[in-house]
Amino acid sequence: MPLKKLESSNNQAIIAEEVALLKEMLENITRRMIGDDAFTVIESIMVLSEKQDYIELEKVVANISNQEMEVISRYFSILPLLINISEDVDLAYEINYQNNTDTDYLGKLALTIKDLAGKDNGKDILEQVNVVPVLTAHPTQVQRKTILELTTHIHKLLRKYRDAKAGVISLEKWRQELYRYIEMIMQTDIIREKKLQVKNEIKNVMQYYDGSLIQAVTKLTTEYKNLAQKHGLELDNPKPITMGMWIGGDRDGNPFVTAETLCLSATVQSEVILNYYIDKLAALYRTFSLSSTLVQPNSEVERLASLSQDQSIYRGNEPYRRAFHYIQSRLKQTQIQLTNQPAARMSSSVGLSTSAWSSPASLENPILAYDSPVDFKADLKAIEQSLLDNGNSALIEGDLREVMQAVDIFGFFLASIDMRQDSSVQEACVAELLKGANIVDDYSSLSETEKCDVLVQQLMEEPRTLSSAAVAKSDLLEKELAIYTTARELKDKLGEEVIKQHIISHTESVSDMFELAIMLKEVGLVDQQRARVQIVPLFETIEDLDNARDIMAAYLSHDIVKSWIATNRNYQEIMLGYSDSNKDGGYLASGWTLYKAQNELTAIGEEHGVKITFFHGRGGTVGRGGGPSYDAITSQPFGSIKDRIRLTEQGEIIENKYGNKDVAYYHLEMLISASINRMVTQMITDPNEIDSFREIMDSIVADSNIIYRKLVFDNPHFYDYFFEASPIKEVSSLNIGSRPAARKTITEITGLRAIPWVFSWSQNRIMFPGWYGVGSAFKRYIDRAQGNLERLQHMYQTWPFFHSLLSNVDMVLSKSNMNIAFQYAQLAESQDVRDVFYEILDEWQLTKNVILAIQDHDDLLEDNPSLKHSLKSRLPYFNVLNYIQIELIKRWRNNQLDENDEKLIHTTINGIATGLRNSG
């Protein structure tokens, strides 16, 4: 049965109704705030924007006072936010409706498993596949947590819109409640007054687990097993989705990540998942009133019941309730042990008096914490078996099944935490250790070969460590060793899986990896036979990606490395950086270099008998590797996905994908389906054509790289253009993350972090990282020989990688606006700097023409009508914000705004990012 499209014409009509209603309410609230006369300014601005009369729009905006700017910029920031909510609600509704009512509907996962069931290795693939979304704290989420909480309420209310229309609930009361929340959001500070701290980022991301991810991952895993069973495949304990996290462990460029934040990240995770179990056990306690006078439990349930401290006379004949009470008591002790704080919600959630917890039995039979999730699961399994023995299998479904599945997936923490640090920091620490131990006085001056010889020798000097209490350590070394010590303690306490990887940013050599091994050895996480934390190189720049094959070949040749990998099921993970490679060489060079690197690294792994797995460091925007997840995965090189893939999810993308459990389920389903399809299917129509396609790409990408670097690195005015004709300075002062905008003082483009680079190009609507250099490179190839355009058209139709590459450019171009970009260019002080815009404009027009020619389309987004419709509905609103932002930046730079007014610029940044939906 074919997969039905989620976007229907009826759905678009509902969205239009909702948007009209939301707009009406927002208008009424704003009128009341500023009066009818002032609101006419907003109305005139809207008319001019819809007519695209940008000259007149600029004049009107220039005459708005600073005081009026506050409400007007707020209005145009809130409106696209409300449109986003409406679209998200209707996507969730359609997913839920088709899953629950349409018997002909088969989601992508169902189709994928159905197709796989007939293959000889189908069961093995389904048992082994593991997709790991890794949530990061990259600063691209501009919304305050308070705003997100209010939007959640509006989301829930809009879910009831159809019921309100149908009279199932009171339409008038529904409208009143919706109006209340829109009024609250309109009168709430959009911008954070202070920069986020790491502890805030940890707390913020936990709301997605509490609100959607635990349920979505658990439900999806259960459905995964059921679908396989439906086709005759009994899976043991598959983990198609597990979660990862950087927050609290990613200290690359962030001095605020410490041993304390790493510990906090793990502790808060334990608290959240244990509270989830406690709540589920509370629900089971309330409902499992089975009487032993009617149903006799097995001996193990009777044993659990006998250990319960619930001494209520009313529970004497209810062994299941008392068994659940005992299990819950042990969870309480487990939470105290793992988090050093009691389960405060426990007794009240169960509905018992506090005396039940302090009965005399507690002194004679102290409740012990669970040693591991395995012990917890064993108690639940005992109850399950008793129910099966009595023919009560129906009672297993629901909360009991959910909590058992959750234990298998999560255990006592939610996500494996990655550690990450820059290679230069590790080199400095190792140099200090070697000097302090009188081994090498100036380690950094050694050649690469000499460095590796020294490091491997020290790694083989077991169990000797280099640090000594007698030798003073720098603050940097103390901090790094403290983090690794905490990592070891957390692994001992919560299990090996809690911290599995350490990523090395800017990996440029084999010694970078051995330097990390030295640091890990200092705290007992590495020895000759085993690495308890896998060393993961991150290749980021074009040059490093080109060198990755040789670096990994040399690394995998060492005997000690072979021992480490052998204890990790023969896997070696490699992280690929999409952001820096794009900033370094442009969109085409980045995409193609990453594609080739995966092929080469996979081959090197096969030569050494090692399974190479890839961790894709993608952002939200195309310029940082973003785009539709399904297409991104299925366009990877065939053979590059063995059975495991990891990918980053960050900033505004986390909210978009995981803010609602139905949408979260849908996105996770897409990730699994795409990964399985890429594992088993050679997507290209004719595999024999791939060599000729590669030759064509090599030629085009070489030209693209030259064109890109000529402007970005060779044009003496480009640096000033970026800093003067974009809001980069204002973006850098926005409180959207704990991490600084640059690793050091910015004096050149290479020193700027990728996120503010991409974020700023999104704000001025050029979207530069997602397309620059594409048009000229393709045009040169097309002009080289007759028939070359037809060859590119054939590649677009038959090669998923190439199709995805161009579709992303198509999407980025549709969000750009050169009329607005021209106005930003006028912010530059000199004509030479302003003239950079015309180079960009020429390339933009050429890129658009070439992309449409290769696609054989008349207009952008012909293949994506839903996005086209969505952009059409929201563009007039956030186009206005660009003109307001330009005017405010002029005033700010001319000292016509005071410090309190800077937040007006930040409001526009927020609104534009909201309208674009993926901005960093």
Curated annotation (Swiss-Prot):
Residues at the catalytic site: 138, 583
EC number per UniProt: 4.1.1.31
PROSITE patterns named among the record's database cross-references: PEPCASE_1, PEPCASE_2
GO biological process: carbon fixation; oxaloacetate metabolic process; tricarboxylic acid cycle
Protein keywords: Carbon dioxide fixation, Lyase, Magnesium
PANTHER family: PHOSPHOENOLPYRUVATE CARBOXYLASE
Organism: Streptococcus pyogenes serotype M5 (strain Manfredo)
Reported cofactor(s): Mg(2+)
Gene3D superfamilies in UniProt: Phosphoenolpyruvate/pyruvate domain
Function of the protein: Forms oxaloacetate, a four-carbon dicarboxylic acid source for the tricarboxylic acid cycle.
Catalytic activity, as annotated: oxaloacetate + phosphate = phosphoenolpyruvate + hydrogencarbonate
Entries under Pfam families matching the protein: PEPcase
InterPro entries tied to this protein: PEP_COase, PEP_COase_bac/pln-type, PEP_COase_Lys_AS, PEPCASE_His_AS, Pyrv/PenolPyrv_kinase-like_dom
GO molecular function, one term: phosphoenolpyruvate carboxylase activity
The keyword Lyase is annotated on this UniProt entry: yes
Identification of the protein by name: Phosphoenolpyruvate carboxylase
Family: Belongs to the PEPCase type 1 family.
Superkingdom of this protein's organism: Bacteria
GO cellular component: cytosol
